[in-house]
């Protein structure tokens, strides 16, 4: 469920349409997008916008109950993981899956948001919560 305002119309539409347990992926510039899944390409140049910048906007604007991350981020991008985890509220469930599983999960997300991030395993699936 949406909490605030996003200026990008495609991002706003996805946030508006998220229901409880719906998912959206924010990915680095190399993450493949499955055929038939909406792709919102925000990449301007290598590194812009960053994964963290786009994640911040979504965390400010949607209620997240669960996230999925590639297990490989622990060894291959620990700094990105550390920063990311500090942004989550204590009640957000964190689930680690293989990178291959994360890519397969993208077949069922509402959209994949492509950033300019060029560090490994900077991909996350956000699962929408509900404010009751």
From Swiss-Prot:
Known catalytic reactions: beta-D-ribopyranose = beta-D-ribofuranose
Gene3D superfamilies reported for this sequence: RbsD-like domain
Annotated Pfam families: RbsD_FucU (PF05025)
UniProt-listed GO biological process terms: D-ribose catabolic process
Protein EC: 5.4.99.62
Entries under InterPro entries matching the protein: D-ribose_pyranase, RbsD-like_sf, RbsD_FucU
Active site residues according to the UniProt entry: 20
The organism's place on the tree of life at top rank: Bacteria
GO CC terms: cytosol
GO MF terms held by the record: D-ribose pyranase activity; intramolecular lyase activity; monosaccharide binding
Keywords, comma-separated and alphabetical: Carbohydrate metabolism, Cytoplasm, Isomerase
Pathway: Carbohydrate metabolism; D-ribose degradation; D-ribose 5-phosphate from beta-D-ribopyranose: step 1/2
Sites where the protein binds substrate: 28, 99, 121-123
Enzyme class per UniProt: isomerase
Subcellular location(s) per record: Cytoplasm
Known partners and oligomeric status: Homodecamer.
Stated role: Catalyzes the interconversion of beta-pyran and beta-furan forms of D-ribose.
Record-stated family: Belongs to the RbsD / FucU family. RbsD subfamily.
Protein name, per record: D-ribose pyranase
Originating species: Lactococcus lactis subsp. cremoris (strain SK11)
Biological classification of the source: Bacteria, Bacillati, Bacillota, Bacilli, Lactobacillales
């Amino acid at each position: 469920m949406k909490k605030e305002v996003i200026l990008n119309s495609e991002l706003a539409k996805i946030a508006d349409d998220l229901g409880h347990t719906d998912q959206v992926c924010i990915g680095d510039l190399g993450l493949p997008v499955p055929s038939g899944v909406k792709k919102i390409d925000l990449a301007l140049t290598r590194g812009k916008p960053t994964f963290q910048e786009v994640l911040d906007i979504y965390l400010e604007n949607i209620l997240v109950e669960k996230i999925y991350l590639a297990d490989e981020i622990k060894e291959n991008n620990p700094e990105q993981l550390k920063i990311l985890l500090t942004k989550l509220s204590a009640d957000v469930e964190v689930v680690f899956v293989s990178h291959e599983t994360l890519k397969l999960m993208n077949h069922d997300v509402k959209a994949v948001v492509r950033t300019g991030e060029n560090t490994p395993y900077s991909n996350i699936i956000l699962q929408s919560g509900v404010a009751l």
